Amino acid sequence: MPSTALALTPGLSSFLKSLKTNPIDTSIENLVSLLKRRQIRHSRSCATATAYLLLRVVSACRTSESTKLIERVQSVGRRLMAAQPREMVVGNIVRRVLGLIRDEAEDDREAEFALSEAGSESQPQTPRAFDDASMPLDRDMLGMRSDGGDRSSRPPLTSMFSLLSHPEPENSLPSTPGSQSPNARLFSHGHTKDVRAEVLEGINEIIDELGQVDDQIAAYALDHIHSNEIILTHTSSTTVQKFLLKAAAKRKFTVIIAESFPNNHEATHATVSGNIVGDDENLSFDSFQKPLIAHGITVILIPDSAVFALMSRVNKVILGTHSVLANGGLVAAAGTRVIARAAKVHQTPVVVVSGVYKLSPVYPFDFDSLIEYGDASKVLPFEDGDLVDKIDVQNPIYDYVPAELVDLYITNLGGHAPSYLYRIVSDHYRKEDISF
Amino acid sequence: MTEPVDSAPTASAQDNAPAQPPSQPATENPPSQQNLPIRDAKTAKDKGPAQSDKQPAKGKDAPAPAAGTESGAAAGGDKPLTPAELKKKAKADKAARRAKEKIERDGGAGAAGGPASGAGQARPPATPRKDVAPGGAAQKGPKAPLLRRGSHGGGSAAVEQKKKKEDKSVAVFGHLYGQQRRTTVAGAGKEVHAAVLALGLQLRDYVVCGSSARCVATMLAFKRVVESYTTPLGTSLPRHLTTHLSHQITYLSTCRPLSISQGNAIRALKLAIADIDPSTPESAAKNTLCEFIDSFIREKITVADQVIAESAAQKIQDGDVIVTFAGSSIVKQTLLQAHHDGKQFRVSIIDSRPLFEGKNLARALANAGLDVQYSLVHGISHAIKDATKVFLGAHAMTSNGRLYSRVGTALVAMSAKERAGGVEVPVIVCCETVKFTDRVALDSIVVNEIADADELVSANAAQQVTGLPDPAAFTAPPIDPKKPKGGKSASSAPTPDPVSSERVPSPSPLASWKDTHNLQLLNLMYDATPAEYVDMVITELGSLPPSAVPIVHRMSTNM
């Protein structure tokens, strides 16, 4: 359905293009089918698509009642998650948006509380131009009424919340744009903005964060890579590439890249040699810079099997990931686990670079359920059809890497020990949204 | 190794002006002129993988300090320059020249594929001074920036090409890049037997692959050599046959480095030759040798394999899930034997690029009716999850108990030993004692074999098996489009349809990797699995722990 409507190949860019014109429900269907068919695959593409879709959903949702907004986002989120349960980034973004709405609702309640005491009421500001001018008033009325009702029933609860739980996240993450700035703006602008505008702004900030996350991570590169180091990495993760490129601007080191054969070797080869041939969705929306080799960095491409042989000479292993779980474990490209294991055996530090958006509040109990299996013909091409009939060919796409194999996480917030991740999780997602 | 590269631009920037005056005396003053080659040779040696981009800069960098020290020596120490010092200097010059010649010779040999480099650099050994001095002067002079700008074209194309070729050896493995593998029989000595000539090419193309197979094939070829051998007048068979064989051996080792088993077999054969009484008539001696070869193959390989397969098959129980890596002949025999014995078990084969040896094993086992699962290296952790035993073949067992086998074996053994939260999976190695060696290895770097990196370029799995022996086709990008299509039909060849253009890009990103600076491909053949990952080595002499390898090796060689 999405591909027939558009001449473009289905993917992130075509989805974003169609998002503006298509009605909401079509867009949701569109993304659901894209996710189902794995036409959107990279975590960041999924995250971006989800964020843009939710932006549309929230802006089209003609209510300022936070509960209704939450319900709407939840229902959309559930559909997206059901479409691709292993793509945890989608759930992460939905949860963050839900958290945003809840935050705003709470702030609003507090504000109402404070304002009614003060008795002052100013015209609500709507900085983002929404289609109709009559809306703000209605919404305000509605909000007032509902909040009033709310307040009468449970003001002590709200105040307890603000006493105990609320101030903490504010203080503990000063540098996340997504969660910090709305509050700051709120306090500076007064408490009169309507929930929806705030939420939209928050979503926009999430989208901004998604765009900048690799560069923010790369900013830590010089803290971790020193001269003449030998670094091993795996797959063609853009986060890792940017990280290394940043360090390459200042320092000379050697990079060994394992090609991650059946699933990502083409992209890896292209990244390594600098001639990007396939216009991957991954590469289309970030201006891909010069390859590492152009910076005078020696790049050695090896087959995955040679990792153990070379590990004794490697100083550091830097890995990208698909998503990070709350216990510090990883779901990363297949083959990552043996690399991390080999690094552990050789006492080589393993550094995982990942945006916070990949950090999922899910605790893995059933590891196998996290693993996705891919196209078996990549392992055994159809030329060997006689063989394919007789044997069971497996092509796992992801590996679960336990937390004890990782020494350090570098996110856009800085470096963390794997054991600290639960804390970041609790900063970013609200408890009530973890299983929505 | 990167430091000089860093400093080069700054040094050259500063020294451009001051470097000019000393460059004139350089041409007339022998010592300074000879200083140049020293520096040159040293820089060239230090940076095997130096990029040709930086080469002019480095050349410029080099003369500047040389000139500095020279002028310092001229100012401070010219008058009291003793004969001893002069002698020392002369000696250093000579050494430097020699080193340079050697490098150039090596470079020429390494770049056998590129005829231009050989042509450009063939002469220098004869007149190194003449060749270098003008070059050095040119680099120092105002021409230098010009050269740098046009670093890709430039007049020194031959030099650059040579540098580029050298570039491609990974620094850590510098010691493993010998001469390039022989590609044709051309240039082989006339004393090399036809059977050996053919075997050499088969070895090179992995037609004969696997430690045991290579050993057997070598011995059979040598048997034919012995059969067709006639002792020349004036020598005796035990004396001359050894040298005659060593020609064959040299040829074989240029095709592919000899395996441990081949080495052991050859050693045994040479011992057998030496044991022959010189007074024995030639035909009798040849018969003895042929019998020796036959019995060696029978005892050390054929029967040994049967014994190992039988005892290893007993280790397999009903319901087992056996994981194995790549395609070992002895493991195949073991599994088939166990299947023959009526055991019910499943086999999970892990395979790797670029050889895909496991595919043949999978085919053989599937044809025999076994339950086979197949995945690549990236699926190790999944395959090992429900494994109950790991069976591995060996290329060799080193004296410190390490298993030296196809690259990737160590990963499998490691995964078996470190399964998170589970019971350790026993790792069983099947290995004939002819593969035991008294060498020791701590890692996979000191002793290893590096295969042609072009094998990695083609991403297409199907081509890897069939079209391997043609690395030349992969290096030349224009041939590529036709290549994948070749097998299908002629109809698709004339029209470069969208399908072909879509499929072609997959090998292309790396097609020109040899011309891409700083990019290196590494295609290792083996890795060393630590002894602690191996629980048991099954040999024809019994099942041993890996620590027993040196003892068995001593026993079997003393026999």
Show which residues each predicted segment covers.
Chain A
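Long amphipathic alpha-helical segments
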Residues: 2-150, 154
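Predominant activation on well-ordered alpha-helical scaffold segments within soluble catalytic domains
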Residues: 29, 48-55, 74-77, 91-98, ...
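Conserved phosphate- and dinucleotide-binding cores of soluble alpha/beta proteins
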Residues: 128, 133, 138-186, 242, ...
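Small/polar-residue-rich loop-to-helix segments that shape phosphate-bearing ligand pockets
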Residues: 182-200
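Glycine-rich phosphate-binding "P-loop"
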Residues: 194-213
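A short, well-structured juxtamembrane/interface segment
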Residues: 209-226
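Gly/Ser/Thr-rich loops at beta-strand to alpha-helix junctions
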Residues: 230-241
